Amino acid sequence: MAQFAQVMAEVGDFGRFQVRLTILMGIPNFLSAFFVFSQVFMVLDEAHYCSVSWVKNHTFNLSAAEQLAVSIPNDTAGRPESCLMFRPPPDNASLEDILSHRFNETQACDSGWDYPENRPPSLKNEFDLVCERENLKRTSQSVFMAGLLVGALVFGPVCDWIGRRPSLLMQLLLSGIASMATAFVSSFELYMTLRFALATANAGFLLSSNVLLSEWVGTSRRTRAMVLAQSNFALGLMALAGLAYGVRNWRLLQIIGTTPIFLLVFYFWVLPESPRWLLSQGRTEEAKQLVQKAALVNGRPLASELLNQLVPEKTGPSGNALDLFRHPQLRKVTLILIAVWFVDSLLYYGLGFQVGDFGLDIYLTQVIFGVVEVPARLSSIPMMEKLGRKWSQLCTLTLAGVMCVIIIFIPGDLPTVATALAVVGKFASSAAFTISYVYTAELLPTIIRQTGMGLVSIFSRVGGIITPLVMLLEQYHKAIPMLIFGSLPIGAGLLCALLPETRGQTLKDTLQDLEQGQPPRSYKTAPQRKDVEASGRTSSARVAVVRSSYF
């Protein structure tokens, strides 16, 4: 009988069929950039002042500037306050008394806010996300990140239950519906609810697409294929900048950014199911048909004798989450990986959500952020091969953290310098995130690899949820968020020095292999041992069995 891996080796690790699938799976990653970061361009800073009805209703015949002067106090810099107004004077007050600021007691805005005329509709001016409601901007981003966590927890089992293909199709449809409905909301609370639903579905299709890709691509090309698919997220960041620059109406931007997902209806006819999943469900004939189709597309038709021998791969014993903490060596590795993944997310989204805070044009900065992500992710592969996994992870996290700390000391009149440092930090954080997937998969034993990946992914999502809340600390001091975004990655990076190197090492299969540091496969003679270890070094340098994508 032939194992699935043997048959797929004859089909080809990365032929024309897998290339097509990589392109198909890259599209959801491309669209995901809009869903994650589009709100940044819908809440841009704009002037706002208390709407003062008594001035508007009076027949003083004052100009707009005079109305502002008699109704709004100035701050310490001499600019009109955004969240305070003078108390309305008595009805019998004369114009002279009002102009002399005789009635100069202030209060919070009680009738809404006025915004510049002819301004495009935005989330900020439609739902008054200013003053005491300004924190809702960050809260809604945390709600979205919480949806990503829930989606990963919910759709992981769904993907295993109904299959990769139907799960992916369902999640794409739900994403489109939730995102399109967001453009027609009448309250910000409803907006946040739909964003949560969108994030849940978004996490689902990212998970399903990467699972499907990992189960079709051979081990020698799996890491590269998944990095290529994830690089489409960076292309989506660049496209988002151009789209947001041209479309300033937030509702229209939401509609245009969502529409492409409905064009993926052709996935219903071209998207294949995972043959590995079909075999696990006992649907052997369907799996054989798919494998033969892939072989024909790759120009490597299979012999019917080999195909008829296809049987599911045998699964070994599995572990649980508690096993990650029972063994001293694995406990140390797990705790450090939790810190690394938490910081990966905190840093990546911290820089992404602050794209407009570095002084340069927000649209230009967004394009630059997208541009640097592509080489950052692609360069992580040769970096890991040259420096090793441990030092690549340590250096990228530390570099990103140092950049964030330096930004704190850059004067506000040097936006180019601050942006340049942020770009270097963005490059390093993107590379660090990609390295984490490979390094984590190689550090954890086979029997508990998926469980461990799931656990650290949860903490990564928690980091994403906390990121917008950390940014709220800027109301106490502007440097606090960037100090946190800088110091934590440096600490996590230095912790990586305590981890073992996995470059050129045989992947561990059991908990005993990890603790004893012994090769996981048995051998009878010295030549067989060399062959096995050489094979392990060859494969482990390229293989990271990653079943989900955070980006």
UniProtKB/Swiss-Prot annotation:
InterPro entries associated with the record: MFS_dom (IPR020846), MFS_sugar_transport-like (IPR005828), MFS_trans_sf (IPR036259), Sugar_transporter_CS (IPR005829)
Gene Ontology CC terms: apical plasma membrane; endoplasmic reticulum; Golgi apparatus; plasma membrane
Transmembrane segments: 23-43, 143-163, 168-188, 196-216, 227-247, 252-272, 333-353, 355-375, 394-412, 417-439, 453-473, 479-499
Post-translational modification: Glycosylated.
Bilayer disposition of the protein: Multi-pass membrane protein
Domain of life: Eukaryota
Cellular compartment(s): Apical cell membrane
Signal peptide: none
A single GO molecular function term of this UniProt record: nicotinate transmembrane transporter activity
One of the GO biological process terms: positive regulation of T cell mediated cytotoxicity directed against tumor cell target
Catalytically driven reaction(s): nicotinate(in) + a carboxylate(out) = nicotinate(out) + a carboxylate(in)
Swiss-Prot/TrEMBL keywords: Cell membrane, Membrane, Transmembrane, Transmembrane helix
Region annotated Disordered, chain positions: 515-537
Summary of the function given for this chain in its UniProt record: Anion antiporter that mediates the transport of nicotinate. Possibly involved in nicotinate intestinal reabsorption.
Family listed: Belongs to the major facilitator (TC 2.A.1) superfamily. Organic cation transporter (TC 2.A.1.19) family.
Protein name: Solute carrier family 22 member 13
Lineage: Eukaryota, Metazoa, Chordata, Craniata, Vertebrata
Recorded name of the encoding gene: Slc22a13
